[in-house]
Amino acid sequence: KEGYIVNYHDGCKYACVKLGDNDYCLRECRLRYYKSAGGYCYAFACWCTHLYEQAVVWPLPNKTCN
Protein backbone atom coordinates (compact mmCIF):
# COMPACT_ATOMS: atom_id res chain seq x y z
CA LYS A 1 0.00 0.00 0.00
CA GLU A 2 1.08 3.58 -0.63
CA GLY A 3 -0.34 6.96 0.28
CA TYR A 4 0.11 10.40 1.77
CA ILE A 5 0.89 10.55 5.47
CA VAL A 6 -1.91 12.41 7.24
CA ASN A 7 -2.26 14.40 10.44
CA TYR A 8 -5.00 12.66 12.45
CA HIS A 9 -6.05 15.92 14.16
CA ASP A 10 -6.76 18.14 11.15
CA GLY A 11 -6.85 15.72 8.20
CA CYS A 12 -4.02 17.52 6.37
CA LYS A 13 -1.18 15.87 4.48
CA TYR A 14 2.37 16.41 5.76
CA ALA A 15 3.76 19.18 3.57
CA CYS A 16 7.27 19.18 2.10
CA VAL A 17 9.22 21.48 -0.21
CA LYS A 18 12.13 19.45 -1.61
CA LEU A 19 10.57 17.14 -4.21
CA GLY A 20 11.85 13.60 -4.67
CA ASP A 21 14.16 12.01 -2.12
CA ASN A 22 13.48 13.79 1.14
CA ASP A 23 14.92 12.92 4.56
CA TYR A 24 12.01 14.56 6.40
CA CYS A 25 9.40 12.47 4.55
CA LEU A 26 11.38 9.26 4.94
CA ARG A 27 11.76 9.87 8.69
CA GLU A 28 8.08 10.75 9.19
CA CYS A 29 6.87 7.72 7.21
CA ARG A 30 9.09 5.41 9.25
CA LEU A 31 8.01 6.99 12.55
CA ARG A 32 4.29 6.73 11.70
CA TYR A 33 4.27 3.30 10.08
CA TYR A 34 7.40 1.18 10.57
CA LYS A 35 11.10 1.15 9.84
CA SER A 36 10.85 -0.63 6.49
CA ALA A 37 8.49 2.03 5.06
CA GLY A 38 9.81 4.32 2.36
CA GLY A 39 8.98 7.95 1.82
CA TYR A 40 9.60 10.86 -0.52
CA CYS A 41 8.12 14.24 -1.42
CA TYR A 42 5.51 14.08 -4.19
CA ALA A 43 3.34 17.07 -5.20
CA PHE A 44 4.59 18.95 -2.12
CA ALA A 45 3.36 16.33 0.37
CA CYS A 46 5.03 13.29 1.95
CA TRP A 47 4.19 10.07 0.09
CA CYS A 48 4.83 6.82 1.97
CA THR A 49 5.53 3.44 0.36
CA HIS A 50 5.69 -0.21 1.49
CA LEU A 51 2.86 0.22 4.01
CA TYR A 52 0.74 -2.51 5.54
CA GLU A 53 -2.80 -2.75 4.10
CA GLN A 54 -4.52 -1.34 7.21
CA ALA A 55 -2.30 1.77 7.33
CA VAL A 56 -4.29 5.00 7.61
CA VAL A 57 -3.42 7.45 4.83
CA TRP A 58 -4.96 10.62 3.35
CA PRO A 59 -7.85 11.33 2.98
CA LEU A 60 -9.42 10.67 6.37
CA PRO A 61 -13.15 9.99 6.31
CA ASN A 62 -15.17 12.96 7.62
CA LYS A 63 -12.04 15.12 8.08
CA THR A 64 -11.13 17.86 5.65
CA CYS A 65 -7.92 19.81 5.88
CA ASN A 66 -8.58 23.40 6.95
From Swiss-Prot:
Tissue expression remark: Expressed by the venom gland.
Keyword field: Disulfide bond, Ion channel impairing toxin, Neurotoxin, Secreted, Toxin, Voltage-gated sodium channel impairing toxin
Any one Gene Ontology molecular-function term assigned to this protein's record: toxin activity
Keyword Disulfide bond in record: yes
SUPFAM superfamilies: Scorpion toxin-like
Compartments, record wording: Secreted
Ranges for domain LCN-type CS-alpha/beta: 1-66
GO CC, alphabetical: extracellular region
Annotated CDD domains: neurotoxins_LC_scorpion (cd23106)
Single GO BP term: defense response
Database matches in InterPro entries: LCN-type_CS_alpha_beta_dom (IPR044062), Scorpion_toxin-like (IPR003614), Scorpion_toxin-like_sf (IPR036574), Scorpion_toxinL (IPR018218)
Cystine pairs: C12-C65, C16-C41, C25-C46, C29-C48
Keyword Disulfide bond: yes
Function of the molecule: Beta toxins bind voltage-independently at site-4 of sodium channels (Nav) and reduces peak current and shifts the voltage of activation toward more negative potentials thereby affecting sodium channel activation and promoting spontaneous and repetitive firing. This toxin is very toxic to mice.
Family label: Belongs to the long (4 C-C) scorpion toxin superfamily. Sodium channel inhibitor family. Beta subfamily.
Comment text on domains: Has the structural arrangement of an alpha-helix connected to antiparallel beta-sheets by disulfide bonds (CS-alpha/beta).
The name this protein goes by in its record: Beta-mammal toxin Cv4
Organism per entry: Centruroides villegasi (Scorpion)
